[in-house]
């Protein structure tokens, strides 16, 4: 289903019983986090806080608090259908002409969707109904959440950050958290490998000393938001992918202060710049790991223009020990990753990122094993194929008779098919998550691969065990009399 903007999505969620309006006064300082956290852990609805303490602007949280709501936002009927999104991405990553009429007909839906990828630029847009600039810019008008007791300041969490480097035509969209440090200043916390950081670095090389234009959109339509967190190919704009998801072209409008394009239906837009050399200490903040992160310096975003829709809604979230909203997104996006990986490694049967592993720090892969050493090839491939997995610390590879999503199955495979010395691969001095304080050096650590597959000749000299399997005829006979036996009542 198509959603023209965030408000349309909210209306559909409410109609489906997936949104709860809270009219009681709730404080953005800690209280919204506690209510949102309890709701998410119970699989509850999105929340619209209509009366934030001290503010007139409502706050939307838990928008993507269940995998099914993520699928809805991507225009799909359920989580399983997200595999189709992964199929689109795998084709866009490595497009191939159809080989014959049959393949042409199979790929026709993709070709039709591609027509929705170019953006549609408007001359005016709802996101610019109200305009504040210069001294009138005031972030204090926005009920920015202060999520955890140890957080240093309020934190913008769903800021859709729009940048363009000097060497690329396409714009980059990314979600980076932003600490509020003044009425017109935020800290732009992005890691070196993220698209926005790369654009800024290249800008400073090409235009030394010049200000770098940046726009942050809050409350865009769901397809645009989710497009920014999906592993789209580097050559493809997230706006284009959002059009593919939505089934209609993404409507944008030129920013007032620069040539960047912003989502036309966004609730709030912050325009401004990064001044080269202007840094500020960011953090500590409670993060998706379940811990407070270290303090480090990041660029300062100075806001020159703040535009809004009338009666704007502030879209927010919190991060903490899983499950949180990023973990839920990880569960849903897991389905998108499977076809991408299978295109490169057809032997992969399933791929699972357990949410308890902070969404990406551990992966379980099942394969149709073909030769000795196959599991090691796959684990090395996972670490290197997609940028999203460069921070995955543990990769467990099992045979296709194991359910990657069932820990009982996976643990059985590890304990019966692995020799710790032979089947463990350790790699040192690799890129690691900056937030991973367990690594010996910030941003640099090790990885472990576990080969929990059945071993082939060449991998072992011993006769390998045969799994116990009941006779199929006996199973069918017992099935036929099971209800009559009434053993379990």
UniProtKB/Swiss-Prot annotation:
Q: What is its main location?
A: membrane
EC number(s) from the headed UniProt entry: 4.1.1.98
The family database entries (Gene3D superfamilies) matched by this protein are listed as: Single helix bin, UbiD C-terminal domain-like
Query: For this protein, what is any one GO molecular function term?
Result: metal ion binding
> How is it placed in the membrane, per its record?
Peripheral membrane protein
Asked whether the keyword Transport is assigned, the reply is no
Q: Which residues are involved in binding prenylated FMN?
A: 175-177, 189-191, 194-195
Record-linked SUPFAM superfamilies: FMN-binding split barrel, UbiD C-terminal domain-like
* Amino acids binding Mn(2+): 172, 238
Q: Name one GO cellular component term.
A: plasma membrane
Q: Where in the cell is it found?
A: Cell membrane
Any matching Pfam family: UbiD_N
User: How cofactor binds (record note)?
Assistant: Binds 1 prenylated FMN per subunit.
Q: What are the record keywords, sorted?
A: Cell membrane, Decarboxylase, Flavoprotein, FMN, Lyase, Manganese, Membrane, Metal-binding, Ubiquinone biosynthesis
Pathway(s) it belongs to: Cofactor biosynthesis; ubiquinone biosynthesis
Q: Where is the active site?
A: 287 (proton donor)
Q: Which cofactor does it need?
A: prenylated FMN; Mn(2+)
Query: What biological function has been recorded for the protein in this entry?
Result: Catalyzes the decarboxylation of 3-octaprenyl-4-hydroxy benzoate to 2-octaprenylphenol, an intermediate step in ubiquinone biosynthesis.
Subunit (UniProt): Homohexamer.
What the record says about family reads: Belongs to the UbiD family.
Annotated HAMAP family: UbiD
The record, for NCBIfam families, names: PRK10922.1, UbiD family decarboxylase
Q: What is this protein called?
A: 3-octaprenyl-4-hydroxybenzoate carboxy-lyase
The species is Aeromonas salmonicida (strain A449)
Q: What does the organism's lineage look like at the top?
A: Bacteria, Pseudomonadati, Pseudomonadota, Gammaproteobacteria, Aeromonadales
What's the name of its gene?
Answer: ubiD
């Amino acid at each position: 289903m198509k959603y023209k903007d965030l408000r349309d999505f909210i209306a559909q969620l409410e109609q489906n019983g997936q949104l709860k309006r809270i009219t009681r006064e709730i404080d953005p300082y800690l209280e919204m986090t506690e209510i949102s956290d309890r709701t998410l852990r119970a699989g509850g609805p999105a929340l619209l806080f209509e009366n934030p303490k001290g503010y007139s602007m409502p706050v939307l949280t838990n928008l993507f608090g269940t995998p099914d709501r993520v699928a809805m936002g991507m225009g799909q009927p359920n989580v399983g259908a997200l595999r189709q999104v992964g199929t689109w991405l795998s084709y866009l990553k490595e497009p191939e002409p159809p080989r014959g009429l049959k393949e042409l007909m199979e790929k026709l839906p993709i070709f039709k969707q591609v027509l929705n990828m170019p953006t549609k630029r408007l001359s005016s847009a709802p996101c610019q109904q109200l305009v504040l600039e210069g001294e009138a810019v005031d972030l204090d008008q926005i009920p920015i959440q202060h999520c955890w007791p140890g957080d240093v300041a309020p934190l913008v969490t769903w800021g859709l950050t729009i940048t363009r480097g000097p060497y690329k035509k396409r714009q980059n969209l990314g979600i980076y958290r932003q600490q509020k440090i003044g009425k017109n200043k935020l800290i732009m916390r992005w890691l070196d490998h993220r698209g926005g950081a790369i654009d800024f670095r290249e800008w400073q090389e090409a235009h030394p000393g010049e200000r770098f234009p940046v726009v942050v959109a809050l409350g865009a339509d769901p397809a645009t938001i989710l497009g920014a967190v999906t592993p789209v190919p580097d050559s493809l704009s997230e706006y284009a992918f959002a059009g593919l998801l939505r089934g209609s072209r993404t409507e944008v409008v030129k920013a007032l202060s620069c040539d960047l394009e912003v989502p036309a239906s966004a609730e709030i837009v912050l325009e401004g710049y990064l001044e080269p050399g202007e840094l500020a200490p960011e953090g500590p903040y409670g993060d998706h790991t379940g811990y407070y992160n270290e303090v480090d310096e990041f660029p300062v975003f100075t806001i020159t223009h703040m535009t809004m829709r009338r009666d704007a809604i502030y879209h927010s979230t919190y991060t903490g020990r899983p499950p949180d909203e990023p973990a839920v997104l990880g569960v849903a996006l897991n389905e998108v990753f499977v076809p991408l990986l299978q295109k490169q490694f057809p032997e992969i049967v399933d791929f699972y990122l357990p949410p308890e592993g902070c969404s990406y720090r551990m992966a379980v892969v099942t394969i149709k094993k073909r030769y000795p050493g196959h599991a090691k090839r796959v684990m090395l491939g996972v670490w290197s194929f997609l940028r999203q997995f460069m921070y995955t610390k543990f990769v467990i590879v099992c045979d296709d008779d194991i359910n990657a999503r069932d820990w009982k199955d996976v643990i059985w495979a590890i304990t019966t098919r692995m020799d710790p010395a032979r089947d463990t691969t350790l790699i040192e001095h690799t890129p690691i998550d900056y937030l991973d304080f367990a690594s010996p050096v910030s941003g640099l650590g090790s990885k472990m691969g576990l080969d929990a597959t059945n071993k082939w000749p060449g991998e072992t000299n011993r006769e390998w065990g045969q799994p116990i399997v009941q006779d199929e005829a006996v199973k069918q006979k017992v099935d036929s009399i099971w209800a009559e036996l009434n053993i379990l009542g």
